Amino acid sequence: MSTLVSLPTVAPAPDYQSIDRPLNFSVAAAAKVRELIQEEGNADLALRVYIQGGGCSGFQYGFEFDENRAEDDLAVATDGVTLLVDPLSLQYLMGAEVDYTESLTGAQFVIRNPNAKTTCGCGSSFSV
């Protein structure tokens, strides 16, 4: 005899196109990206931020320059510099801020992510 089992429903992916600013790209981060793009000598570059499995907390952030924008990428422009995020990564980054900080301990890009339940000590991986 077979039994029907109902599966839990999955919430639909957020419609980032209807949100005014689903991700914040700070002026400080944009300025640093502009500087790095100028060093590369390719004005067509944008900074891509993505999430991948790994790190001590389960997920980790990745950054890379990209000339190609996919049709479904979110593009956030700050001071003429573009940040790209793919839809899968955006689910984990909704409401986050991409910033750049300089301190006595060094300079780095920082993601302040309200969706991260825990982060590792170095700040490069998180869990949800």
From Swiss-Prot:
Lineage: superkingdom: Bacteria
Gene3D superfamilies, per the entry: HesB-like domain
GO biological process assignments: iron-sulfur cluster assembly
Gene coding for it: erpA
Name assigned to this protein: Iron-sulfur cluster insertion protein ErpA
Function: Required for insertion of 4Fe-4S clusters for at least IspG.
Keyword Phosphoprotein tagged: no
Source organism per UniProt: Xanthomonas euvesicatoria pv. vesicatoria (strain 85-10) (Xanthomonas campestris pv. vesicatoria)
Subunit structure: Homodimer.
